[in-house]
Design a protein with these regions (language model features):
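Accessory interaction regions appended to the cores of large information-processing enzymes
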Residues: 1-162
Length: 162
């Protein structure tokens, strides 16, 4: 199940009747890195990754190869089955120019992130903490908008929790 890869994204071909044939064809064009896995399924190509950013390169490759014919579903958080259901919790680090730190702190709090450490290095403010992955989806794009493209961030799976 790739427990270490808590994000899934499906790719389908709008014009091919057999999604598994599309997935097998697409798989030949993709280089599988250490931080992602790709599987052909009856629903299309399943792509599993450690973070949204880890899927950017394969998504760009599929868009370049298939253009408008490829249907990319939004990223989905993968939980561990059982009672109770276990969801992925991510450790994150965000570095942003000091002038954008208030907006970024507010964004992290709105996402129910637990900021465990905050410090400044020269003109950069760094936030470290944890949050459920479901609350962090889309964070990269939002940080780029808040900081005019000057932020950096990284996430990794910390653990699973109910």
């Amino acid at each position: 199940m790739y427990f270490q890869l808590p994000i899934e994204r499906m790719a389908r071909h709008r014009e091919m009747p057999s999604q598994i044939d599309f997935a097998r064809e697409a798989l030949l064009a993709l280089e599988e890195p250490d931080y992602a896995r790709f599987e052909p399924t009856e629903r299309g190509l399943a792509m599993f990754a450690a973070s949204e950013e880890d899927l950017e390169r394969p998504v760009a490759t599929l868009q370049r190869l298939y253009g408008e014919a490829v249907d990319l579903r939004p990223p989905r958080v993968r939980c561990l089955p059982g009672h109770p259901l276990q969801q992925p919790v991510m450790a994150f680090e965000v570095a942003v120019p000091r002038e954008h730190s208030l907006a970024v702190r507010q964004e992290l709090r709105q996402r129910d992130a637990r900021i465990e450490e905050e410090y400044q290095r020269r003109r950069t403010c760094v936030f470290r903490g944890i949050a459920p992955l479901r609350d962090l989806l889309g964070l990269g794009g939002r940080l780029a908008a808040l900081s005019r493209g000057t932020s950096r961030h990284a996430m990794r799976l910390s653990h699973y929790a109910p």
